[in-house]
Curated annotation (Swiss-Prot):
SUPFAM superfamilies: Nucleic acid-binding proteins, Translation proteins SH3-like domain. GO terms for molecular function: rRNA binding; structural constituent of ribosome; transferase activity. It comes from Polaromonas sp. (strain JS666 / ATCC BAA-500). Belongs to the universal ribosomal protein uL2 family. Residues 224-256 are annotated as: Disordered. PANTHER family: LARGE RIBOSOMAL SUBUNIT PROTEIN UL2M (PTHR13691:SF5), RIBOSOMAL PROTEIN L2 (PTHR13691). Keywords: Ribonucleoprotein, Ribosomal protein, RNA-binding, rRNA-binding. Part of the 50S ribosomal subunit. Forms a bridge to the 30S subunit in the 70S ribosome. One of the primary rRNA binding proteins. Required for association of the 30S and 50S subunits to form the 70S ribosome, for tRNA binding and peptide bond formation. It has been suggested to have peptidyltransferase activity; this is somewhat controversial. Makes several contacts with the 16S rRNA in the 70S ribosome. The keyword Acetylation does not apply. Residues 229-246 have a biased composition (Basic and acidic residues). One of its GO terms (cellular component) is large ribosomal subunit. The gene is rplB. Gene3D superfamilies: 2.30.30.30, Nucleic acid-binding proteins, Ribosomal protein L2, domain 3. This is Large ribosomal subunit protein uL2.
Length: 274
């Protein structure tokens, strides 16, 4: 993939950096795997805003991606690699030997025409999915399950991966890109390799309108609001917070730990690096 630096023909184009999609499929997506995607704009069933800074954006269909990869011992051929507007990673369309087609997260180095397979007997090759107990220690993996049979939840974004560090009994230790080391059951599945589109982090939007196309509305700082709207608001002229930083509801932010799931705390061997 190539990085395209746009010429400064307008203020919005100045500084804009795009990621080339020349290697991706040019036609329409596979229609049977499309579902309607309804814009909620951050509102709940009462119409109240529950997630701020959401609304608008370009319409798109949801691509149904197979995160379980549980069609064991059936080879699948990569028909094409496509752009997915719902995620940073690219997706690959697989055609199984029995005729079924599914989308998967495209790993780095996957080429059209390659053959993939899932199951405990699958070879250690990029794009193949196996239980963690069958993956060699030290391997780079992505699309990792956290619960057996639930489907991949870890390392699904562009350029992400994890490293299998060790196996102890029924659990394996996996180090994520954040530095967190977590215990995962050895019967959970993972895919060999790392996610493609690693240049995504080099993208520069160039103008505010691109954010609006993505369905992201402006974020206003609390210090420029009125006291009725935010704890940081008010004051004569330009002032600071005057207190420890908090969110609009008064909860501490900027470093305050918010993790509240004590049930799975024992699965974290070491916390992520700041």
């Amino acid at each position: 993939m190539a990085v395209i630096k746009m010429k400064p023909t307008s203020p919005g184009m100045r500084g804009m950096v795009k990621i080339s999609r020349d290697h991706l499929h040019k036609g329409e997506p596979y229609a049977p795997l499309l579902e309607p995607q309804f814009q909620k704009s951050g509102r709940n069933n009462n119409g109240h805003i529950t997630v701020r800074h959401k609304g608008g954006g370009h319409k798109h269909h949801y691509r149904v991606v197979d995160f379980k990869r549980n069609k064991d011992a059936i080879p699948a051929k990569v028909e094409r690699i496509e752009y997915d507007p719902n995620r940073t990673a690219h997706i690959a369309l697989l055609c199984y030997a029995d005729g079924e087609r599914t989308y998967i997260i495209a790993p780095r180095g996957l080429e059209v025409g390659a053959t993939l397979i899932s199951g405990s007997e699958a070879p250690i090759r990029v794009g193949n999915t196996l239980p963690i107990r069958n993956i060699p220690v030290g391997s780079t993996i992505h699309c990792i399950e956290m619960q057996i049979g639930k489907g991949a939840q870890i390392a699904r974004s562009a350029g992400t991966s994890a490293t299998l560090l060790a196996r102890e009994g029924t659990y394996a230790q996996v180090r994520m890109r954040s530095g967190e080391v977590r215990k995962i059951h050895i019967e959970c599945r993972a895919t060999i390799g790392e996610v493609a589109n690693e240049e995504h982090s080099l993208r520069r939007l160039g103008k505010a309108g691109v954010k609006r196309w993505m369905g992201i509305r402006p974020t206003v700082r609390g210090v420029v609001m009125n006291p009725v709207d935010h704890p940081h608001g008010g004051g004569e002229g330009k002032t600071g917070e005057g207190r420890h930083p908090v969110d609009p509801w008064g909860n501490l932010t900027k470093g305050y730990r918010t993790r509240n799931n004590k049930r799975t705390q024992v699965m974290i061997v070491s916390r992520r690096k700041k």
